Amino acid sequence: MGTVNGEYEDFDAANRRAEVIDWLGGLLPEFDLPLDSSDEELRDYLINGEALCYVADKLMPGVLEGTWGGYASDQRSNVKKFLSVVAEMGLPGFGVKDLEEGSMSSIVECLLALKDNVATQLGGHISNSTAKTPIRRKLELRETDGPVLSVATPGKRYPKSQQRSPLLSGQKINEVVQFKHGTYTDLPAAKISEMLHSNSLDNAPTQSLLRVVNGILDESIERKRGEIPHRVVHLLRNVIQEIEHRIGIQADHIRNQNSIIKTREDKYRSKIKALETLVNGTNEENEMAINRLEVVKVEKSKIDEKRKLGEQDMIRLIREKENAENIIASLHQEMQVMNRMHEQFREQMETKARQMEEHLTLRAKEAEFCLMQSKKKVEEVEATSQLKSQLWSKKANIFQSFMNNQKLSIKDIKISSQSIKQEMYALQMTWRDEISNIGHDLKGLVDAAENYHKVLAENQKLFNEVQELKGNIRVYCRVRPFLPGQDGKLTAIDYIGENGEILIANPSKQGKEGYRMFKFNKVFGTHSSQAEVFSDIQPLIRSVLDGFNVCIFAYGQTGSGKTYTMSGPGTSREDWGVNYRALNDLFDISLSRKNAFSYEVGVQMVEIYNEQVRDLLSNDIAQKRLGIWSTSQPNGLVVPDASLHPVKSTSDVLDLMEIGQSNRAVGSTALNERSSRSHSILTVHVRGLDVKNGSTSRGCLHLIDLAGSERVERSEATGDRLKEAQHINKSLSALGDVIFSLAQKNAHVPYRNSKLTQVLQSSLGGQAKTLMFVQINPDIESYSETISTLKFAERVSGVELGAARSNREGKDIKELLEQVASLKDTIARKDMEIEQLQLLKSKSPNSMTDRNGSNLLRQSTSSTGLSSLPVASQQNQQLSGSVEAEAEDNASDDGCSVGETEYSPAGASETSAERAHKAPSRITRFFLTKNGQPSTSRPKPREVVPKTQGSMRPGTAQATGGSLAKPSKRR
């Protein structure tokens, strides 16, 4: 009985759901669900609430717009709007959770109730409209103020003449409905005739037609006389006929639906009665059948399980059979092999048996002979044993007497041991008390040691901050481990402390005089890895992204591991040196800051070989020689003619570094098989742009691998190696002079004595963070070089450069720099024109030159438009005076521009193109002051420096008050 009732309930629910789907299909054109759709399919279509809101708006236009503001993006809001409309109508609703995950019966009941309510209202309007006049219907419409509901016939479609077209219904009838500025009597007859002859009334919505009727009736009531023009009456008659036609169609549809529903109800009642009769008569049979069915189901499930188990057993047996067959085949093959081996073994054993038989026969004869001899020996042994037994009996008597004496001694020892135990117990108690006192004292020592380490760490942090504020050159010392095969050598390193101490032992002296202690910022022992070394300098390198200039260089004798520390022995990640790790770290940080900052990274790699600067990343490295800027430039370039390669990732850096290392000058000496014969300089330029405020920052990282200092008698250098060693020692000596001058705070620092010190001028001269790696050899043979290197490092650690400054430029400074660049370009063009005029003047007569020159100058002035530049006229006059003064200074000098080295042969004349190339150097007096404002003041007199042994010209360019003085010529 329960099963039948359940089936009937499912059947009834399916019919009601199909009825709802049929009704929604008539209302919504895009509703395409089949009538036999499940609850889940209907739920998926209605769950967002838009279809429910569309149904409510379709049945009652404007009910959502005035109250709720249209559809919402949230599905719960749409469903709540629909439920509010249903509640206002007094119809049963449903819960939001029922629509999301509950039963669909409540949703179906709600929609059917809404359908019945709409059909009831529509039937009442039809009966009233057929019995009353148009004026009465119009007045009732005003009283009820309810919308006329139009429900499409489900399962049917209007004919082509009645299908709604948005274009047709939106053009003709809307012009009449929205005619507000005039009256309907003012409508022209041609427009009304066009509407009547076309299908505009057929395609127009019922609401629009009712508005037309209401408008005409309102107009007639307002006139009070009731006079309506004939054309308007004709229009009104057609509109009313169309409305009555539509209402009739709706009434026919409702009657058809009612008859269909009654027929279905009669069928369902008869089926219900028959089912009730059948159910009442066959309850017991149903129960028995159900029980049997359950038993059959259980047996069927068991049979299915057995069948599945049998199939699994069959599959398993088949697999086992296949495995057994494979095993049998392999065993058969093995058996054949074993048979063959057995035959061979049997033959070998037979041969061995014959040999053993012959051997045993010989052994038997030998055994018989030995037996005869053994019998003789037994007789001799028996005689000797009797003698020995007599001796042992005598010894036993002696031992017995000895044992008696020992027992007496043991008694005495036991008595003494008791006394000793008592004494030991007393000592243990004394020791226990002393140990407890020692533990208490030791705990105090441990606490004091912990506090000592904390205070030591704080002091180290404060010391680093003081060093940062003072701008001291950080000095890190690294001890090279012994090379393979040198483990047996003596070392000069006696002790390495945790706080930067290193103790050097002198093998030729004894006692305290044989030891020398040095202290630096950090000392790395022989077992320190590349990662440990880089972790200590990582914060220093990261400050490059904040706009600081950083310089890291390695100093030490040949073979002390400078190139190992800076570049590493190979390209594997574990062997990376400071160069690779620094650039990789910069890329990682720039990637993490990409939302706030945009960074551009460029790489230069040059070497100083025999006092010549060469580009290691250029193809013509052997021919091209580069000059050095003697002053710090706004773009941070020290060697501007060297190729600057932009890099985007670590792989780009690896490729460039591999090219640079292959082009670097190396050679073999007695101290190092692959000795660096030049100073390698890797310069990383980082330009940052703040995405928010547009400010820029510029940082420069110099990674310098100095060539090793060496003694000629130890390196056994000759020929080119000797010349290279002389240049290397000379440049390192010049570096020592610079360090000594900085340590003494002299007014003049001899940067110009070497190309190396010129490159390091921007780093050693302040406004930069500088770090020096001191590389030393541990062997005792290099003691003198080690002491010399550590003394130099100790002197460097005392140099104070002042606090480093960040190179940041605001948006205003950036605009001023752009204006300066445009002025430089304009003045460069003017210089070229002036030089052309001078050439014309030297070639042509004076009269022709003056006339033509004035015309040419007038034309060039008008063409360039110098007066339109955004600079005051007073600044232009000062700038022109500065340019003229600069031209006079250059005329008195040898024509070498800023940062350029003169390589042209003596007596060679410069072409106009070369002078044009050097022309921008004449405007270097147009500079930015400290507050970011442009200035064109004259430079102060140059500092005159006496000539040194390096044949350097005096007049080093000095930056005074923000202006750039004229550089001098260098060779």
From Swiss-Prot:
MF GO annotations: ATP binding; microtubule binding; microtubule motor activity
Residues that hold ATP according to the record: G556, Q557, T558, G559, S560, G561, K562, T563
Organism whose genome encodes this protein: Oryza sativa subsp. japonica (Rice)
The protein's name: Kinesin-like protein KIN-14C
Polar residues bias (residue ranges): 839-881
UniProt family annotation: Belongs to the TRAFAC class myosin-kinesin ATPase superfamily. Kinesin family. KIN-14 subfamily.
Entry annotated with the keyword Transferase: no
UniProt keyword list: ATP-binding, Coiled coil, Microtubule, Motor protein, Nucleotide-binding
SMART domains the record matches: CH, KISc
Gene Ontology biological process terms in this record: microtubule-based movement; microtubule-based process
Gene: KIN14C
InterPro entries named in the record: CH_dom, CH_dom_sf, Kinesin-like_fam, Kinesin_motor_dom, Kinesin_motor_dom_sf, P-loop_NTPase
Disordered: annotated span: 839-971
All copies of domain Kinesin motor, residue ranges: 472-799
Residues forming coiled coils: 272-357, 809-844
